[in-house]
């Protein structure tokens, strides 16, 4: 029996829920899918347990790529990332493995913005999310309009502080849990129900405010590998988000590891357990590769058009060093510093070999001070595929301390 085919009849957008623990991110994800099913836009809804159990399975290593929930609105097809309890959540946000085109920031009206709210907002800005919609959840628990007004003002101030325009960013109040409860109580479809209509308002706002990104369809195919698994009798599947180009069934591709590569071909393409004849830039897909064993593949490897990439271990980059207020270091670092470099889906140790002015390579520097915009020569512990203009993050001790862009490749 052939697998159901994925129908590409609406623009595809990657979105995610971010915010403090227990503010209702997973409940909201469930409510969105349930309301859209009620409207007849999407076939499947997900319960809280559906979404939460996939996180537990992921922790135990049973399933792959379960952080994505699929749904359709009137206008779009969405891949929705909901993994607040996932061990790699922060890491994945940073490296862009679950790169989002936009986000829904969930804040409980019982608590207002909390430490993790700020952490996720800062991360969203750091990984290049330009627009988000705020959902002020648990409105049913707060009957004081002054408290709601105060939290809205506090949220606007926080948005401005971290580079999101509060005059443009939509703030929507509602209760994800009440919407789910009301759907269960309904004897007939009522989209005007107070709590259900608020979730519909959120979905419509996401449709209109979060812009559809430009996809790099004309560049050579490239997909950083987020995960892989072996299907008995079929072979190895690699999962990830296609960064550039298009891949079709039976295309020849090259699997790039550390300083070595292997030619293979694509014998299966899937998105959300549905077959595809081709995957496109922006799609979260699984690719079944011919003749590849699981041991050939690691997270951070890249699958791409043959002979389109080269290996490098040393490069020049322009760095911005975050200040302590931006979540970075309080102290400067010097030549010989060895942090982690998060490049695509890979995190790898590297060493700062040289620090110098962005305007004059001969103007060498002894220290990189938080707040500096400087150039550096960086040597990685292994050779990997790199390109000019590739962006990366620099991490140390569980926090981001800088961002960079490759300006030249050395060796």
Swiss-Prot record:
G5, as annotated region: 175-177
G4: annotated span: 137-140
Protein residues bound to GTP: 19-26, 82-86, 137-140
Keyword annotations of the record: Apicoplast, Elongation factor, GTP-binding, Hydrolase, Magnesium, Metal-binding, Nucleotide-binding, Plastid, Protein biosynthesis
Family: Belongs to the TRAFAC class translation factor GTPase superfamily. Classic translation factor GTPase family. EF-Tu/EF-1A subfamily.
High-level lineage: Eukaryota, Sar, Alveolata, Apicomplexa, Aconoidasida
Gene name in the database record: tufA
Record GO biological process: mitochondrial translational elongation
PANTHER family: ELONGATION FACTOR TU, MITOCHONDRIAL (PTHR43721:SF22), ELONGATION FACTOR TU-RELATED (PTHR43721)
Residues that, per the record, bind Mg(2+): 26
Renumbered residue ranges of the record's region G3: 82-85
EC number: 3.6.5.3
UniProt protein name: Elongation factor Tu, apicoplast
Functional summary from the UniProt entry: GTP hydrolase that promotes the GTP-dependent binding of aminoacyl-tRNA to the A-site of ribosomes during protein biosynthesis.
CDD domains from the UniProt entry: EF_Tu, EFTU_II, EFTU_III
First and last residue of the signal peptide: none
Region annotation G1: where it falls in the sequence: 19-26
Compartments in which it is found: Plastid, Apicoplast
């Amino acid at each position: 029996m052939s697998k159901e085919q994925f129908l590409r009849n609406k623009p595809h957008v990657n979105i995610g829920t971010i915010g403090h623990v227990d503010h209702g991110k997973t409940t909201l994800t469930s409510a969105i899918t349930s309301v859209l099913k009620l409207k007849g836009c999407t076939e499947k809804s997900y319960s809280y347990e559906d979404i939460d159990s996939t996180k537990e399975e992921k922790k135990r290593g049973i399933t792959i790529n379960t952080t994505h929930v699929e749904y359709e609105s009137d206008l779009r097809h969405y891949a929705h990332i909901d993994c607040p309890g996932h061990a790699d959540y922060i890491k994945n946000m940073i490296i862009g493995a679950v790169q989002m085109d936009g986000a829904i920031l969930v804040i409980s009206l019982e608590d207002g913005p909390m430490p993790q709210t700020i952490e996720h907002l800062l991360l969203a800005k750091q990984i290049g999310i330009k627009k988000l919609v705020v959902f002020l959840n648990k409105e049913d628990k707060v009957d004081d309009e002054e408290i709601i007004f105060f939290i809205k003002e506090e949220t606007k101030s926080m948005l401005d502080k971290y580079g999101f325009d509060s005059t443009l960013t939509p703030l929507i109040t509602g209760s994800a849990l009440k919407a789910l409860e009301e759907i269960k109580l309904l004897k007939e479809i009522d989209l005007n129900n107070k709590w259900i209509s608020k979730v519909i308002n959120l979905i419509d706002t996401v449709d209109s405010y979060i812009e559809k990104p430009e996809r790099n369809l004309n560049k050579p195919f490239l997909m950083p590998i987020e995960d892989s698994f072996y299907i008995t009798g079929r072979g190895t599947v690699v999962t990830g988000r296609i960064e550039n180009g298009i891949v079709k069934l039976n295309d020849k591709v090259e699997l790039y590891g550390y300083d070595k590569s292997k030619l293979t071909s694509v014998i299966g393409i899937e998105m959300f357990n549905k077959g595809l004849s081709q995957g496109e830039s922006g799609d979260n897909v699984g690719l079944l590769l011919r003749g590849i064993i699981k041991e050939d593949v690691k997270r951070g490897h890249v699958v791409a058009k043959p002979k389109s990439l080269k290996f490098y271990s040393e490069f020049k980059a322009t760095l911005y060093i975050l200040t302590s207020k931006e979540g970075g270091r309080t102290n400067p670092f010097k030549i010989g510093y060895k942090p982690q470099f998060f490049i695509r889906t890979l995190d790898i140790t590297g060493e700062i070999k040289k620090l110098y002015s962005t305007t004059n390579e001969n103007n060498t520097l002894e220290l990189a001070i938080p707040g500096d915009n400087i150039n550096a020569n960086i040597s990685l512990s292994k050779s990997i595929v790199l390109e000019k203009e590739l962006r990366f993050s620099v991490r140390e001790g569980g926090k981001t301390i800088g961002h960079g862009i490759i300006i030249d490749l050395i060796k």
